[in-house]
Amino acid sequence: MSEIGERVKKIVVEHLGVEPEKVVDSASFIDDLGADSLDTVELVMAFEEEFGCEIPDDAAETILTVGDATKFLEKNAKS
Amino acid sequence: MRRVVVTGLGMLTPLGCGVDATWARILAGDSGCKKIDTFEVSDLPSQVACYIPRGDGSGGTFNPDQWMEPKDQRKVDDFILYAMCAAKQALDDADWHPKSDEDQFATGTMIGSGIGGLTGIAETAVLLKERGPRRISPFFIPGRLINLASGYVSIEHGLKGPNHAVVTACSTGAHAVGDAARLIALGDAEVMVAGGAESPISRIGIAGFCAARALSTGFNDTPQKASRPYDKDRDGFVMGEGAGVLVLEEYEHAKRRGAKIYAEVTGYGLSGDAFHITSPPPDGNGGFRSMSMALKRAGLAASDLDYINAHGTSTQVGDEIELGAVERLLGNAASKVSMSSTKSATGHLLGAAGAIEAIFAVLAIRDNVVPPTINLDNPSVQTAIDLVPHTSRKRDVNVALSNSFGFGGTNASVIVQRVTN
């Protein structure tokens, strides 16, 4: 997993309180990791904070899995 | 009206996590007060508070992870976490874990708070100013709202009856017990999980009550002496944190399922002072009327009372006004009644106070013992009423009344008594 992928995984484990093994690229935040709609809003905020970038609402709507987040941040991360 | 009994108790107080842990230390005359060490106090007049004892969960300590998932703890202010802790204890104690639709629909929640998520609101206001609205968590609002204590408890335990919350400052806990009992009496629920929770020990909380000149300021170096109701050297209350929750149940429902029955809630009185936002009227007529109404509701005379758990916060003005109202209520019966303020040991838990004190009243009946008013070295006035100075005392307790009075001139009195058939 990429360095950005590792950082994404760490945030997801911390915020959703899930086992690290479950946080794989194909895992859906809502369907596989038990997040609700408010959790996903907070996750996006945590990504913004960690990677120093803004994730607009229309982009956030396309981030449904761990892999989606990693892919987006590999392109857009500023820190 | 249908009869309402107490079948479960749960508490988290500055004296311990759990009813047994707290009660043992109350009866031993311990104080839960210490120097504030979680934030800067050098510029605050009051520097003492009654913290819940955090630890690994052993020896009566509070381990948050035993009561709420860490990921959920992050989303809420502590009063909700404390409510979750006390509510689980109470439901386990009552052995009431409703699973069927019928049982879930018949079980409600009424857990209030005086202030709710003050700390989280203060921190988020700073975040908003410094970083802007995009940094505000989606959990900011649902984690601070007072009724979310009831909300979280109802979700955790599948309680689908009335989902309500009381907000009446320092009489919240007593109003919650009284109002929840009333919902059962009127048939809106068979079981209610009722009480209060508070987490006010923060810089803004202490600063706010200091500004209102409500807190003790003269015992910063001897914190365990700071809360001293009725004593001539008292100089304000000591802030406390925690939660108290009771499981209230319709009498026949409790009997049918063979539940352990602690006591019956027979009296409840409420009144307003219509006088001042923070001070009671000098004649204490609001407290007098709420006590009188509770006696009337219970069908009792003042001479039937054995124990009164006083509001008694250790403020200069309030203690003597309440005492005067109680003397007027009791008349010639004053010498047979014991009245103590357990706030001398726990500090003032604001919205949780009335709930933990209703529990102490129930335990006084169960064990035929009255808890002490600690630090009462020199009463500021003479009274025929036994104020139970320093040490607990064995005595018959069949009828107990608990008083709670709040800012805004709101008063509540709850009477619990030994169950008779």
Swiss-Prot record, chain A:
Keywords: Cytoplasm, Fatty acid biosynthesis, Fatty acid metabolism, Lipid biosynthesis, Lipid metabolism, Phosphopantetheine, Phosphoprotein. It comes from the Bacteria. GO terms for biological process: lipid A biosynthetic process. Pathway: Lipid metabolism; fatty acid biosynthesis. Pfam families: PP-binding. GO terms for molecular function: acyl binding; acyl carrier activity; phosphopantetheine binding. The modification O-(pantetheine 4'-phosphoryl)serine is found at residue 37. The keyword Methyltransferase does not apply. One of its GO terms (cellular component) is membrane. 4'-phosphopantetheine is transferred from CoA to a specific serine of apo-ACP by AcpS. This modification is essential for activity because fatty acids are bound in thioester linkage to the sulfhydryl of the prosthetic group. Residues 2-77 form the Carrier domain. It is found in: Cytoplasm. The keyword Phosphoprotein applies. HAMAP family: Acyl_carrier. Belongs to the acyl carrier protein (ACP) family. Carrier of the growing fatty acid chain in fatty acid biosynthesis. PANTHER family: ACYL CARRIER PROTEIN, CARRIER DOMAIN-CONTAINING PROTEIN. This is Acyl carrier protein. It comes from Nitrobacter winogradskyi (strain ATCC 25391 / DSM 10237 / CIP 104748 / NCIMB 11846 / Nb-255). The gene is acpP.
